[in-house]
């Protein structure tokens, strides 16, 4: 496994953050940097050479999760950045194609395995490689998410399928002027449920 939550990219991210916080053993930083660079190259190659139907795109352990892990790693290890740009280009192409081919009103539009997480990866990849964001596609996907929220009627506050995940996407949409309106419309829809007082947030559901 190579994903963020149960795979090598998540372990590498943990090693990098810990190494930066408590200090590296002799040669440790260079060793981890090589592993990270190899991981970025492998992720880009796999996504480039594999049919869309055979690619796990999701934000838990798929391509979207790897992009997020290695983008964070690159903040600590600048030597990873040159290859990260290629991973971003490939991720942008794959996520854009996935979004265009996904049903317009999925039953689950959540962050972990569906539209919200893939759209967030598309945004991140576009900005990382300096490409223009397809604002029409973004608006279509946000409308699909809103339709799924309204159709469900009782969306959890959790991260994987619920309000917390949608809020994470909305915050990133609002970071950029060309997608801010879409982010604000999503925030407006989830605000009452996201901020309602509860005994248990259930971040994993």
Tell me the role of every PLM-derived stretch.
Residues 1, 30-52, 85-105, 132-153, ...:
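Long, well-ordered core segments of solenoidal/helical folds
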Residues 54-121, 127:
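Solenoidal tandem-repeat scaffolds enriched in leucines and small polar residues
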Residues 115, 119-122, 139-142, 163-170, ...:
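A general structural signal for well-ordered alpha-helical packing
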Residues 156-157:
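Interfacial loop-to-helix transition and helix-capping segments at the boundaries
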Residues 4-10, 59-62, 112-117, 160-165, ...:
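Glycine-centered tight-turn and secondary-structure capping sites
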Residues 11-25, 66-79, 117-131, 165-180:
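Well-ordered alpha-helical scaffold segments within catalytic/enzyme domains
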Residues 1-41:
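Well-ordered mid-protein domain cores that form the structural environment of catalytic cofactors
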């Amino acid at each position: 496994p190579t994903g963020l939550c149960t795979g090598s990219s998540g372990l590498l991210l943990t090693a990098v953050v810990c190494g930066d916080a408590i200090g590296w053993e002799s040669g440790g930083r260079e060793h981890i940097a090589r592993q990270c660079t190899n991981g970025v190259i492998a992720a880009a190659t796999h996504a480039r050479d594999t049919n869309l139907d055979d690619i796990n795109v999701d934000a838990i352990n798929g391509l979207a999760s790897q992009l997020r892990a290695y983008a964070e790693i690159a903040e600590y290890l600048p030597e990873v950045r040159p290859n990260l740009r290629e991973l971003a280009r490939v991720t942008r192409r794959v996520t854009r194609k996935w979004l265009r081919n996904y049903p317009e009103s999925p039953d689950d539009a959540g962050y972990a395995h569906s539209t919200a997480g893939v759209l967030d990866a598309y945004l991140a990849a576009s900005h990382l490689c300096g490409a223009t964001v397809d604002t029409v596609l973004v608006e279509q996907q946000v409308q699909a998410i809103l339709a799924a929220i309204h159709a469900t009627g009782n969306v959890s506050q959790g991260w994987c399928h619920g309000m917390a995940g949608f809020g994470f996407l909305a915050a990133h949409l609002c970071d950029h002027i060309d997608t801010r309106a879409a982010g604000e419309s999503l925030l407006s829809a989830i605000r009452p449920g996201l901020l309602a007082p509860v005994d248990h947030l259930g971040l994993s559901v």
